[in-house]
Amino acid sequence: MAETIRIIGIDPGLRYTGWGVIDLAGNRLQFVAAGTVSSDVQCDLASRLCQIHKGLSEVVHQFMPHEAAVEHVFVNKDATATLKLGQARAIALLVPAQANCPVFEYAPNKVKKSVIGVGHGAKEQIHMMVKVLLPRAEFDSNDAADALALALCHSMHRKRIDQSYQARMAI
């Protein structure tokens, strides 16, 4: 029987941070849970980051993933918005790392290519393929669906990552 690897995908955002947890056993994928951590827009930035940290910490503590996949930040024209997203992303990287969970990062185009077969696609296509690959998946937001897509992407690439790591260790 294949070892089960639990993967959490995290789609960082300052207002909404999506998360999705799947189990991978051999080639079998199983939906575990998904949701969204929200921060209060009325609060200052530091308080909002604390809210995201607390929420993600609870999720990681509850589901105890073995590996994490986090989306790379895209740079947009609004430097302030990009910086704030980067701060939320730092929390998304920090929380699993604090739980001794290796963190892997994926560009949005790589996630789309892995899940729907092309690097550019509508959110609806991604959500549809998440449901095809994880028929029991339930998600409360686009962010949670995107987080499940991140976890799926990592499940497809982790064998290659593992082989690359083992090859480096053999040198």
From Swiss-Prot:
GO CC annotations on file: cytoplasm; Holliday junction resolvase complex
GO molecular function terms attached to this record: crossover junction DNA endonuclease activity; DNA binding; magnesium ion binding
Active site as annotated: 11, 71, 143
EC number per UniProt: 3.1.21.10
Keyword Lyase belongs to the record: no
UniProtKB keywords: Cytoplasm, DNA damage, DNA recombination, DNA repair, DNA-binding, Endonuclease, Hydrolase, Magnesium, Metal-binding, Nuclease
Residues involved in Mg(2+) 2 binding: 71
Subcellular location field: Cytoplasm
Domain of life, per lineage: Bacteria
UniProt binding sites for Mg(2+) 1: 11, 143
InterPro entries: RNaseH-like_sf, RNaseH_sf, X-over_junc_endoDNase_Mg_BS, X-over_junc_endoDNase_RuvC
An individual GO BP term: DNA recombination
CDD domains, per the entry: RuvC (cd16962)
Catalytic activity: Endonucleolytic cleavage at a junction such as a reciprocal single-stranded crossover between two homologous DNA duplexes (Holliday junction)
Predominant cellular place of this UniProt entry's protein: cytoplasm
Cofactor(s) of this protein: Mg(2+)
Listed transmembrane segments: none
Cofactor note: Binds 2 Mg(2+) ion per subunit.
Pfam families assigned: RuvC (PF02075)
Entry-linked NCBIfam families: ruvC
Assembly description: Homodimer which binds Holliday junction (HJ) DNA. The HJ becomes 2-fold symmetrical on binding to RuvC with unstacked arms; it has a different conformation from HJ DNA in complex with RuvA. In the full resolvosome a probable DNA-RuvA(4)-RuvB(12)-RuvC(2) complex forms which resolves the HJ.
Family membership noted in the UniProt record: Belongs to the RuvC family.
Purpose: The RuvA-RuvB-RuvC complex processes Holliday junction (HJ) DNA during genetic recombination and DNA repair. Endonuclease that resolves HJ intermediates. Cleaves cruciform DNA by making single-stranded nicks across the HJ at symmetrical positions within the homologous arms, yielding a 5'-phosphate and a 3'-hydroxyl group; requires a central core of homology in the junction. The consensus cleavage sequence is 5'-(A/T)TT(C/G)-3'. Cleavage occurs on the 3'-side of the TT dinucleotide at the point of strand exchange.
HAMAP family from the UniProt entry: RuvC
Protein name: Crossover junction endodeoxyribonuclease RuvC
